[in-house]
C-alpha cells in the first residue's frame, strides 16, 4: 500500500520539480485553463510528450517557488513569469518551436454545451433551417423572439438569429434551446495568453509573424530612421549613404556655378555649355546595340527552312 504524502511533502516535491524545469528550459507558454477537464489535460500532456512539460498548480505556490529559485541561484530571468500568474493558468515548458507547440495545444479543444450561468467566450448565432422539432415546442422560440414557421410538420427557423453575445451570461431559455437543437457553441482548451523566452515576455500573436513580415517591418523602420536623420541632419547608418550623395550634389552644384572644378565636374560643365555633345552620346550607345543585333538577324536568316510535306515525298491526296 502506497504511503500518502503530507501537504508539506507535496509542496517540497512540487518545488523540486519546478526548480528542475527552470534549470532545464528557457521557453515557457502561459496558458489559461478555464473549463479544461482532467481527461482533456491528460490528452494534451500525452500529445506534447517528448519536448514539452505541462505544469499546473496554485499561483501562490508557483510564485513562491520562482522567488526561492531566484534567491538560491541568483537567476532572476524567470521573475517576469510571476506577474503573468493571474487566474486559472498553467505553464508549458518546452524545448520545441513555440508556434508548433501552441498549434499542438490548440488541437485538443473540445466542444461544450452552453450551460446556464456561463459567460459566452464567442457570439452564438443560430442558423436558419429546419430544426426537426415538432410544433408543440414553438414556445422556446417565442420566448427568445426567434421568427419561425411550420414546414412539413416541423419548426423551421426563418432567419439567422444572434442568440448570445460575447461576454453575456447564458440564460436558462438559451441553454435549453441550444440543447434541443444539439448545438454545442463553445469550445474549451488550453489557451495560450503569453509567451516567455530567455527573460522576454511577448504576446502569442508574435508567433504568427513570418520571416517576410519581419523583413518588411525592419525595412520600414530603416526607411523612417533614414528620413528622420536626413530631416535633422543627424548621421546614422541608414542615412549616411544618402548624406554623401546629397553632399556630392551640393559640391557639384557649387562647381558648376563657380570657377572651381574637378574632373567629374568638367564633364558636366562641358555638357551644359554644349548640350549637343550629350545628344550625340545617346545615339552612339544605341548604334552599338543595333550593331550587336545585326549578326543575330543574319544567323536567323541563314537557318534552313523546314521541308514541306511534298518535298518529303508526301501529298494530301496520297492513298
From Swiss-Prot:
Gene3D superfamilies: 3.30.70.1730, 3.90.105.20. One of its GO terms (molecular function) is large ribosomal subunit rRNA binding. It comes from the Eukaryota. Residues 286-319 are annotated as: Disordered. Disulfide bonds: none annotated. The keyword Ribonucleoprotein applies. It holds the Pfam family RL10P_insert. GO terms for cellular component: cytosolic large ribosomal subunit. Phosphorylated. Residues 304-319 have a biased composition (Acidic residues). Belongs to the universal ribosomal protein uL10 family. Ribosomal protein P0 is the functional equivalent of E.coli protein L10. P0 forms a pentameric complex by interaction with dimers of P1 and P2. This is Large ribosomal subunit protein uL10. The lineage of its organism: Eukaryota, Viridiplantae, Streptophyta, Embryophyta, Tracheophyta.
